[in-house]
Amino acid sequence: MKILVLNSGSSSLKYQLFDMEKETVMAKGVVQRIGIDNSFLEHENYRGEETTIETDIPDHNRGIQLVIDTLQDEKYGVLNNMEEIDAVGHRVVHGGEKFAESTLITDEVIKQIEEVSELAPLHNPHNLTGIRVCSKLMPGIPQVAVFDTAFHQTMPRKAYVYALPYEYYEKYGIRRYGFHGTSHKYVAERAARLMDKPLEELKIITCHLGNGASVAAIDAGKSVDTSMGLTPLEGLVMGTRCGDIDPAIIPFIMDKENLDIKEVDNVLNKKSGLYGVSGISNDSRDVEEASKDGNERATIALEIFKYRVKKYIGAYTAVMGGVDAVVFTAGIGENAIEMRESIVEELGFLGVKLDRDANNNRGKEIEISTKDSRTKIFVIPTNEELVIARDTARIVES
């Protein structure tokens, strides 16, 4: 079975084609600058052959058609014809309360995704565009929606209801949803395999640390709490997002800086986090370099970032009544050696012992705790596309 996985953004389109027999990637690539000047497609096949196609890509329709054509290209392609694709799996950011698992796309499902799009206005409309274009260009080929929020729908009510007037939840669906669900699910399952124990017997804390960052408490394979909330703004300090703050700061800033609500929202989402505190960059590597050079604001930004991660690990250990493993994943989690060391070294109260030699690796699946560490620590590169492909294959086969 061959599955095409698509992640449609506002001006970009990422894709991977999987052969599910051995779960291998046949081809992958990205369409960049859709609807903008100097648009292009970057493509690589399983033979390691790469190509860049620079052409006018005015919309997603042209972008997806270009992907289909490139997958069938005589030199760089891996398919003889489009009919070899058995199904298409789409990343959809927000499923609200309507979707607790991945689902086969129908007209009714599209309508329901539209209904929750106000909860993810920067993502869902573009995800829907990808779905509609595929329906038009690939009629008859089944499509599956895989939601970032679905994995967290197992959270208990006490974890997802905010202490606001309850009618806001009833009328508007204001509650904690959580994100990065496919990533948290994948690395938790991998951790269980590396421990050679059933996932159902484990308490795992997964730390997805990238430009967007979240932590999840996973008890017996189910998400019981997560740091992101109604939107991806809550929780950890991120590249440009503030994470947890006192809500009263918002009207205070509006008054002091003479800003309207959209301007404050822009500050919290795009001008805060590592970037806002350091004044340098949203990229943790740049901030770390500046900190080493003696930049105090960069040092403060990193201290806050690490402190918030440790705070959530401690909280989620309490939520689950213990923890068997902590997993680091995503760009920072997989590659920031000193960041991991600093976080893990202060988890001694959990019986954690760091293996510094093992930790001295980037982007590699590895246990970084010692053999006698009571709580295991892993670095596991995430693979959200594979989760989408697996879910798509499972749903289409059933």
Curated annotation (Swiss-Prot):
Q: Which SUPFAM superfamilies match?
A: Actin-like ATPase domain
* GO cellular component terms listed in the entry, alphabetical order: cytoplasm
Query: Which residues hold Mg(2+)?
Result: N7, E384
Q: Which UniProt keywords apply?
A: ATP-binding, Cytoplasm, Kinase, Magnesium, Metal-binding, Nucleotide-binding, Transferase
Entry's InterPro entries? Ac/propionate_kinase, Aliphatic_acid_kin_short-chain, Aliphatic_acid_kinase_CS, ATPase_NBD
Where, by residue number, does substrate bind? Answer: R91
Q: Key word ATP-binding present in the record?
A: yes
Q: Where is the active site?
A: D148 (proton donor/acceptor)
Task: Provide the reaction this enzyme catalyses.
Answer: acetate + ATP = acetyl phosphate + ADP
EC assignment: the record states: 2.7.2.1
Binding residues annotated for ATP, in chain numbering: K14, H208, L209, G210, N211, G212, D283, S284, R285, G331, I332, G333, E334, N335
Q: What class of enzyme is it?
A: transferase
Q: How is the cofactor bound?
A: Mg(2+). Can also accept Mn(2+).
**Entry cofactors:** Mg(2+); Mn(2+)
In terms of one coarse class, where is the protein primarily found? Answer: cytoplasm
- UniProt similarity note: Belongs to the acetokinase family.
* Role according to the record: Catalyzes the formation of acetyl phosphate from acetate and ATP. Can also catalyze the reverse reaction.
Q: What is this protein called?
A: Acetate kinase
Which taxonomic lineage is given here?
Answer: Bacteria, Bacillati, Bacillota, Clostridia, Halanaerobiales
Q: Which gene encodes it?
A: ackA
